[in-house]
Every structure is written in C-alpha cells, then in structure tokens.
C-alpha cells in the first residue's frame, strides 16, 4: 500500500512540475478540462451542464466518482485556462482608493491555471490545478503588484465499481486539499462559485470555516455511491505539512487546525428523463488555533452544519440548473483565544443560483447570497486606530454594526462561441 501511495504521489509531483513549467507558455481558455475530453472521447457538454464549468452532469459525476478513470490514458494529460477581466465600480469612495479599488476600469490578465488530470491506473486518477495569480500581492510602499504561482484544488482518487443486475456500487478514497472538493454537486462550498473579479468589491469575506480551508489542508476521505441514488462521504482534515506539503505549495497558512477534523456528507439523488435532483446535508467540526504562526494553546471550536439541494434539466438545446445551500455555523471559545468578545457566536450563510444555457453557447444566471450572524466588536470591528491617537471607520470591509450581515445579487450573461472559450458580463449589487 505504501509503495502504491508513493507511486501516486510521484505521478502527481511530476504532473505539478510540468504544470509549473507550462503555466508560462500554454495559451488558451477552457471551461472544462480538454484533457478529460481527450481521455473519454466526449465533448465538454457530456460532463458539464451546458458546457459550463464546474457544473457536472450525471455523466460528469460518474466520471469523477470512478476516479477520473473512464476512457484511455493520454500521453500528456494537461490543460490550461486563462482568465482576463475588466471591472468598473460605481462608487469608489475610500480613504485609500488606490488600494481598495486598484485597477478599476482597467482591462487586465487576471489568472492562469494549468490542470493535470486523468487516469493513472485502472483504479487511480488525479485532478490537480496550479494557478498563477497575476495580482497576488501589492507592495505597500510602491503600490506595485506582483504575481505568484500556487497549488489550487487537488484531488487524488482510488475508486472501484461493483455492477450487477440489481446493484451498482461505487466506492473509493480521496486525498485532497479542500473540504468538499471531492463532492460532485455544485452546492457545497468548494464548487458553489460564480466568476468573481479580482478587484471588484464583493462584501466582507466572512464565510463558514468549511469554506476557508482550501489549499491549506490535507484530507483523506472514504465515499460510496449506491445505485446512483445514495452518496455518503466521511473525511478527516489536518493542516498540510511534511510529505503532504505539496498540497499547499505556494499558499500561506491563514487557518491552522489542531489535530484531525472530521467532515461528513450525505446526499440522495434521483434521475428521471432529462431531470435530476439532489437533496443533501453536510457538516464539519474544526478546532483552529488563533495564530497560525504559533500552533499551541487554546483553540476556537467551529461547528458547521449545512443543507443543500440541486435541480437540473438537460435536454438539448436547453440546460436549466438551480442550486440552494444553507450553512449554520456555531463558534465557541473565541473569547479565550481572542478572536471574539463573546464566548459563543453564530454565522449563517445562504446561497441561491439559477441558470439557463441555450445550445451550450448562450446563457445567463442569477445568484443571491445572504450572510448573517452574531454581533461582536472583536470579530467584526468597525473602527481602527487612525495613527494619531484616535479612531476612524475601517473602509470597505469594516462593519459599523459589528456584525457580518451582507447580502447581494449577481446577474450574469455569458457566451461560448466555441467549446473552450467563454465571455461573460456580470453585475454585483
């Protein structure tokens, strides 16, 4: 088993080395992985609803759950994605607009990613993403920006399938670096994304802990999918280190976990004709050190509990999808660790999204989110030291009411003239 694991990690490290080298030279833009399409012989719309990454079709979910192993292994399983953006903010009032609204009304090259993915053996497959962020850091003195390359979502799987006249059982293991990245529906935190701009204001960044650990942790999980109906997963996460440091390569540890932290997932899925629907629950317990640089002493205890559902209608030329998720987080011990004034707080986050795509080319979506929670002057400060012995309002991200309450709408229109190119326009309010 150790030899097999070493072989898989060796494959992945080779993939990542190639990805880092090629990230500077591979052009193009992709909504789905062309390497997966080459391996399976299928087009992007076979795996992605309306061709829109990352929303998976039933076939796409099957491909992922069976370890990315369907089809024949290709010689060079690499793909590339490039994202450019232009952002115009209506109200740029700020004490430091060059920082808070940098590059406003400027067309720019935002990020580039290289993906290494596909079949390694009959039962082992990999999805690995390396991303270059062209505007990763800003020098506080010169205000100049610099780029940075880092590990993104990584999922290494072992999977098998038992088929019979009345039985279809898929089971496997996933080694990954983001809670819920192993999931196959687009309602969990790792995949319930719209297309954000790097410089647009999208409200305070407060989110449940399950959504804050990506690319900082290592998780090992076991999962099963019975008769394409019942999905169950249980995983354990720790801060990535030692032999698993490649899972966080290039990323700063902002949230350091104490020991092992469980994540569980249960979902029921049903498919009839062009329709499919899912209803699920998920949860995570996490013990977090207050200072990631000094992992010792008391911890803050986070308990996330979520419910989600998804609907899809897939019948050419129409694709309709709808998603809903709600996460309630309880936070305890923050007064001891210094991250909050209260001994106990709560955080609630709801997300809704609906989309329509015609002929996998023209489409639109409407998203809504709402975050609420306990008032706490330490966790959600509204004032800061002005450097002259007084206090001033924290611009942009501060909360005058000392709470995380935020809500917003994101309508979007998009066009895919060819399979691997997507152009979109969105409005955030």
Predicted regions and their residues:
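N-terminal secretory signal peptides that target proteins for export/translocation
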Residues: 1-12
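Boundary of Sec targeting at the N-terminus
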Residues: 31-33
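The canonical Cys-X-X-Cys-His
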Residues: 42-51
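Outer membrane beta-barrel
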Residues: 55-57, 78-88, 103-242, 258-274, ...
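Short cysteine/histidine-rich metal-coordination sites, predominantly Zn2+-binding motifs
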Residues: 56-70
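Transmembrane beta-barrel outer-membrane domains
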Residues: 73-75, 105-109, 147-151, 211-215, ...
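Detector for outer-membrane/organellar transmembrane beta-barrel domains
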Residues: 274-411, 415
